[in-house]
């Protein structure tokens, strides 16, 4: 039984694991300023980071939560996943492997 590359049905693991992974990665990219602020605060504060970095942690959580709860952002990530899956089903090559550069000394 061959899989149809253009099929839109999502399995449980795709809905609950793979698409949320894409959402987390893209949200971290879009909240990079808050991620950097929180990381810097943690590095500078050491053990006291729990107390000293509350403001940065709250800003980071607010930014990430806004993306996690945005239905349009979920659909954008879902379409990106479906496109990657369709390409994989056509070529058999995962996206990460396709993006790697070929050696130049061949």
UniProtKB/Swiss-Prot annotation:
Stretches assigned to the CHCH domain: 28-71
**Residue ranges annotated as motif Cx9C motif 1:** 31-41
Which is an annotated Pfam family here? Answer: Cmc1
This protein's GO cellular component annotations are: mitochondrion
Q: Please verify whether the record's keywords include Mitochondrion.
A: yes
Per UniProt, the short sequence motif Cx9C motif 2 occupies residue numbers 53-63
Instruction: State whether keyword Lyase applies.
Output: no
Single annotated GO MF = metal ion binding
Alphabetized InterPro entries for the sequence: Cyt_c_biogenesis_Cmc1-like
* Chain positions with N-acetylalanine modification: 2
Q: Which family does it belong to?
A: Belongs to the CMC family.
What is its biological role?
Answer: Component of the MITRAC (mitochondrial translation regulation assembly intermediate of cytochrome c oxidase complex) complex, that regulates cytochrome c oxidase assembly.
Name it: COX assembly mitochondrial protein homolog
Lineage runs:
Eukaryota, Metazoa, Chordata, Craniata, Vertebrata
């Amino acid at each position: 039984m061959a899989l149809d590359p253009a099929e839109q049905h999502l399995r449980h693991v795709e809905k609950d694991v793979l698409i949320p992974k894409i959402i987390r990665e893209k949200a971290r990219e879009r909240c990079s300023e808050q991620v950097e602020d929180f990381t810097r605060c943690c590095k500078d504060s050491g053990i006291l980071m729990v107390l000293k970095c509350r403001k940065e942690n709250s800003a980071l959580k607010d930014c990430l939560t806004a993306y996690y709860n945005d239905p349009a952002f979920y659909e954008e990530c879902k379409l990106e996943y479906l496109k990657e899956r369709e390409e994989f089903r056509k070529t058999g090559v995962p996206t990460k492997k396709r993006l790697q550069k070929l050696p130049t000394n061949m």
